[in-house]
Structures are given as structure tokens and as C-alpha cells.
């Protein structure tokens, strides 16, 4: 069997060690004669899996006991609506940063429920960075302050936590578990699983208990209420059990790697060496302000875009898969989440160097 280096933005690469465990356990999980995918979500087997996954994630991120961790369905995009539905309360305004594609979609969704106030707009910089925080327009009152920590399409990542007195809400779909951060600075964090935590179909929400006391908008369906999910411990109905199980295996893998801090150092090395190569090249280019360059999603363009198809074809032939950029931006994108090895990044750099020699 020959596996390729998978640079997909999501669903993304899963650590091989985790895949081997899934393979070994798939038909007979822990000697019960069934797959974990077949057991009842309310049986002791899966309840144990679910509780252990939550404990491990809480430990990895140092999540205080004053926060609930929810394992939900619907993908992160559903959170674009659930956040205002549950957190607006009596407010008419919420603060957003437009930093790229995913924050822009969240803002558009929020307009169905409130007046989203833009603190700043990276469009002014052609989405190559974030305007200086000293220039942000911050109201004194609003229901919450929302931003996307890492924009997968635009290749922008926040190197800091925004300074605000408002309740901080963050979409960490593409970089949760990639570096340590202070959970207590946030009111709510959410992340879909298919970047750093396994399979599409699972979204993790970390929410402070105080926010669960806010009254949802009257039109909010009961199934979309955080408080009800918290009360039922994410078991209102059948959860995505296999995705939850796989996320738990990945949490174990992160612990075995040495924890989030160790992965953060590795992620920094991977990104730094790829950006260093691109910056030295006269053939490849990355337009993002170095301060805001994503460690997870490295976008780049070829000097001659007529060679794009050839680049992708030869990359695939060399075991480097899914490097095509997002349809909205074009170009190339190497997504180097936690599961991408340093060897994979080295292989990409070597291929890019050889391609430049032949076509530059």
C-alpha cells in the first residue's frame, strides 16, 4: 500500500496511527463482537467513548469547569446561525470582523437576526492581512464579538486574541488543537472536526455556562438551542457516533505526541520552511502579510498560471495530492494541519524546487 501526502483543506488528512487503530477496531471494538459504529449511542460502550473524548479534549485545551463541551451535528456553517440565535438575547447588534470568506459568510447569515457591526474589514487590504487593532471601530455595547481565527481560503490567521470587553466568539474550525490558547478569554468557541479532529459531520462547541442562561430568540428551534444540548450532554438525539469516536482517537494521538504545545512547535516549523522557500523563489508567490500568514493553509501562485494544470498533474504523480486552490481564489493551497508530517512538507518543497528548475 502506498499512501500519498494529502494537502486537502477538508476533509483533511488523518494521522496514520489513528487510521490503523480504526482499521484494527472496525469489526470488533474491544472484544464486543461489534463495530463501535453499530452500538447504541445510549449503551455503556459508547457512553464511555464519549465521556473519555470529552475528558481528553478538556485536558488538552485546559478547558475550565465553567464551560460545557458540546459534540454537535450540522457543521460549522450551522453555527453561523446558532450563535446569533442563542447569544443575541435583548441586543440588536453584534460585532464582527470580516477577515475572509468564512467570516463574510457568517456576517451574511447574521444579518437575518441582527445588525452585524464591522469592527474592521480586511477587504481594505485585499484580504492579505488584518487592519491594525488601534483602528478598529468598537461599540461600547453589543451581544458578542465574532471572528474567524484562521481563514482557510484566504490563508490568513490571527497571531493574537483580539482585545475586547465584549463576549468573544471564535470560529476555530481549522486551527483548534494546533496551538495552545487561553480558553477563558472566550465566551464561545466552535470548530468542525474535518480539519484537525477527524470526520465531517461533527462540530465541537465550547461554551461558557453564563451564556447558556441567555434566552434564545423566540423563533429558535429547540434543537438549535445550546442550553438544551448542554442539559442533554449532546444526546438530544443520536449524535454522529463514529465521528465522535474518531475525534476521541485523535485526542489520544495529540496527547501521545506530547500535547498541543508540541504540535504547535511542529506546525510552526512546517509553515516556516514552506514560506521560506516560497519567499526565496522567483516562480512562486504568497501575497499575505507575513504577520498574518496561516500556519494551516499556505496559499501560493505560480508566476505563469498557464502551468497550473501541469503543476497539479505532476504533483499528483509525485504523491502530493489536493493542492488545487479554492475555487474562489484559484492558485494553489497546501493545507498542513496537525496530521501533515514534516516529511510531507519537505517532499512538497522538493517537488516545487524541481518544478521551478524545469519551468521557471
Curated annotation (Swiss-Prot):
Gene (name only): serC
Catalysed reaction, written as an equation: O-phospho-L-serine + 2-oxoglutarate = 3-phosphooxypyruvate + L-glutamate; 4-(phosphooxy)-L-threonine + 2-oxoglutarate = (R)-3-hydroxy-2-oxo-4-phosphooxybutanoate + L-glutamate
N6-(pyridoxal phosphate)lysine modification, residue list: 195
Record has Glycosyltransferase as a keyword: no
Pfam families recorded: Aminotran_5
Record family assignment: Belongs to the class-V pyridoxal-phosphate-dependent aminotransferase family. SerC subfamily.
Cofactor(s) in the UniProt record: pyridoxal 5'-phosphate
Protein's job: Catalyzes the reversible conversion of 3-phosphohydroxypyruvate to phosphoserine and of 3-hydroxy-2-oxo-4-phosphonooxybutanoate to phosphohydroxythreonine.
Protein name in UniProt: Phosphoserine aminotransferase
